[in-house]
């Protein structure tokens, strides 16, 4: 599930897309599930 957007924004593989879309580009998983 979704976690802190800031955490994913800085460290997530989806990068800035996490902060904007809340999802990784080309993925259906939300940023909270991306590491």
UniProtKB/Swiss-Prot annotation:
InterPro entries hit by this protein: Lysozyme-like_dom_sf
The protein's enzyme class: hydrolase
Keyword check for Zinc: no
Reaction catalyzed: Random endo-hydrolysis of N-acetyl-beta-D-glucosaminide (1->4)-beta-linkages in chitin and chitodextrins
Organism: Capsicum chinense (Scotch bonnet)
E.C. number(s) listed in UniProt: 3.2.1.14
Name this protein carries in UniProt: Endochitinase 2
Entry keywords, A to Z: Carbohydrate metabolism, Chitin degradation, Glycosidase, Hydrolase, Hydroxylation, Plant defense, Polysaccharide degradation
Protein family per UniProt: Belongs to the glycosyl hydrolase 19 family. Chitinase class I subfamily.
Gene Ontology biological-process entries: chitin catabolic process; defense response; polysaccharide catabolic process
